[in-house]
Each structure stands twice: as structure tokens, then as C-alpha cells.
């Protein structure tokens, strides 16, 4: 198999999994290797198998956010690796990080990096923009100290000595 063919096969595996997530599939095992690992940023945690992924990520996300529309913006592939950045449009209809449901529509920005082995996803490194979600729900995790204030001209950025 050529490198380009391998890349296209990897992309097909990842897109099929993304479609299954978007369709609320409960049969995700056909997309993941038996040794699957899901490694998220702070607040997301690490899931060491498909059962942990389902119980500690997929179902809590469904409980907190309904009317989800998955919108992958771009896929990049390189052999057995694929990456995607995008967002999920959703309604905050269940408790999230201690915040009671607000029924606000939010954007959940994410970036994923997947490794595909033998036609199955074995590793998934994930970054979900929790500070942005929380800000949309009225919680400023930076307590007014976010560097966006520099961009808006509201604060002077520090300079190195």
C-alpha cells in the first residue's frame, strides 16, 4: 500500500468514527483497537480503554450537552496519523463542571490527534477548550486575568527584563 493510500485509509477510519459519534452510536467498538487510549487535557482526563472512554467521556458529554451537532473543520493525515480541529454546537442541558443547566447553546472547540493501527484507532490525544465552554456559561476561569485583555488594549502585557 502506498503512503497516500495509507493516509486515505486512516482518514476513512477516523471520519467513520466521527460520524458514529455524531449519530450517538452506542457501538463504537468497531472503530477502536482493544488497547485504545484516550488522553485529554486538564479537565478531560485519561481513558485507558473503550469502556472508560464511553463511561467517563462519551456519556457525561451526552448528559451535559444535548442537541449536539459535530462540525469538524479540517482533517490532516500523515500515514497512520490523523488530526482534526473543529467544534460541537450543543445545548447545555445537564450539569457540567458543577454548573447547573443553562439551556444556552455553546460551541465546544476541540482538537484530536489519532493513531490508527490495523484499521482501528489505538491512541487519541485530545484538547477540548474547557475555558471557552465555561466562559460561554458565565464562568471566567482566569478571574479577569486572561491575556485577551492585552488584545483588547485593556491591560499592558508584561515585558521580559
Where are these regions (language model features)?
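Short, low-complexity N-terminal intrinsically disordered segments enriched in polar/charged residues
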Residues: 1-30, 34, 144, 149-161
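A short acidic/glycine-rich loop-to-helix N-cap element
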Residues: 99-101, 134-139
